[in-house]
Amino acid sequence: MTQANRVIIFDTTLRDGEQSPGAAMTKEEKIRVARQLEKLGVDIIEAGFAAASPGDFEAVNAIAKTITKSTVCSLSRAIERDIRQAGEAVAPAPKKRIHTFIATSPIHMEYKLKMKPKQVIEAAVKAVKIAREYTDDVEFSCEDALRSEIDFLAEICGAVIEAGATTINIPDTVGYSIPYKTEEFFRELIVKTPNGGKVVWSAHCHNDLGLAVANSLAALKGGARQVECTVNGLGERAGNASVEEIVMALKVRHDLFGLETGIDTTQIVPSSKLVSTITGYPVQPNKAIVGANAFSHESGIHQDGVLKHRETYEIMSAESVGWATNRLSLGKLSGRNAFKTKLADLGIELESEEALNAAFARFKELADKKREIFDEDLHALVSDEMGSMNAESYKFISQKISTETGEEPRADIVFSIKGEEKRASATGSGPVDAIFKAIESVAQSGAALQIYSVNAVTQGTESQGETSVRLARGNRVVNGQGADTDVLVATAKAYLSALSKLEFGSAKPKAQGSGTI
């Protein structure tokens, strides 16, 4: 593998992906995802936007102290205060990057920035020079680049390269471009930019027209050697380019691209499942690579062909992307040390002995209900337990559901708020409705339910049900998750989890005037 054919994978799940409505993660959840991304083999982890809030700064800083192989990056606007906060946040990382940006399209410069092109260039150059005080690895992005004038882009990119930028990122911020135009744009821009051959060119594509992956691949054909993407394509609006699709497209169609990545493809599905569990965003069954149906064959002709020779209808194996990782993990006789070791193997570290003891107690309860415990069960269990460890949270204690044909279901539920036990009862059009009404009779949150979903963690009737609840109130949108072999218990846990984030979680407003690439 040479530098010319090596593609750098820049994962922004923890920054751009987290901007999906309700996908905000706690610091501990971000660290879990970062560890899995490092295991996946991504080159750059964009850990967040350090200047956006104190919580963001803490999360970026914690990831910088945790990750040793991947480069840890923070986004920042082309503003000195932002850049210095980013530099301080990533300082502990063995390998660190600052990613600074400013808008370059005529519409953004005129209406958002209210700056002249010359002023934008001056701000960009100053930003890169400040970033170089903290690290030699500086990325510069031209927000809304694909709607910018190419001659102006060449001028500003040449200026920031001279100032010390080592990576130039060209985002399709609003998902406007189409593949052949993207390839042409990159080819022309790289040639026109002074010293354009001395830096790594990067693509960051949004999926508003469903073309994020196609545009990213086209950018590679046009000379880019870094792709910015997210697990499961998570991101604002219609999302970002998905890391799994880009990586497997390059691997399966190596004959066309001749490009390599450093990704361990067997970690793709585990990464997808972890991000889905933590964010509460389920993966659609027909999603390429990581969807539950990605390797299913219903047609008799297809089934016959696959049985005779797999490659008749499969261009890659399920095992190559990690579907074989649905392994039996532990059983009811497994001890605490075996449990702790298994969590470490899965990249899960709990912050205290108290947290480990609580998770182990939950594991033993689960093992009594479910004969076979799989890796996915442990991920769901730990996510559920970590969500209830906060002392200032809503915590599930117990519930009784009464249903009879022709009668309204009734829910009697016991839970606590800040350690104070509460009891509530309600009837509803169904058991789920009754549970939500019972909780709300005490919580009085005033939140609107946006999404309620249930997914089986593993196969079989003994599987844990993993539920997601999305609540909205004002400009706050939160996701809550719950897991249990009883889906109605999981439902109550998910609703209480969402309420905990809504009432006690720190709000995370964007920094004033911030944009997104």
Swiss-Prot record:
Keywords: Amino-acid biosynthesis, Branched-chain amino acid biosynthesis, Cytoplasm, Leucine biosynthesis, Manganese, Metal-binding, Transferase
Cofactor(s) of this protein: Mn(2+)
Pathway(s) where this gene product acts: Amino-acid biosynthesis; L-leucine biosynthesis; L-leucine from 3-methyl-2-oxobutanoate: step 1/4
Entry's Gene Ontology cellular component terms: cytosol
Domain Pyruvate carboxyltransferase as annotated: residue spans: 7-269
Tagged with keyword Cytoplasm: yes
Compartmental location: Cytoplasm
Reported function: Catalyzes the condensation of the acetyl group of acetyl-CoA with 3-methyl-2-oxobutanoate (2-ketoisovalerate) to form 3-carboxy-3-hydroxy-4-methylpentanoate (2-isopropylmalate).
Protein name as annotated: 2-isopropylmalate synthase
Natural source organism: Neisseria meningitidis serogroup A / serotype 4A (strain DSM 15465 / Z2491)
Classification of source organism: Bacteria, Pseudomonadati, Pseudomonadota, Betaproteobacteria, Neisseriales
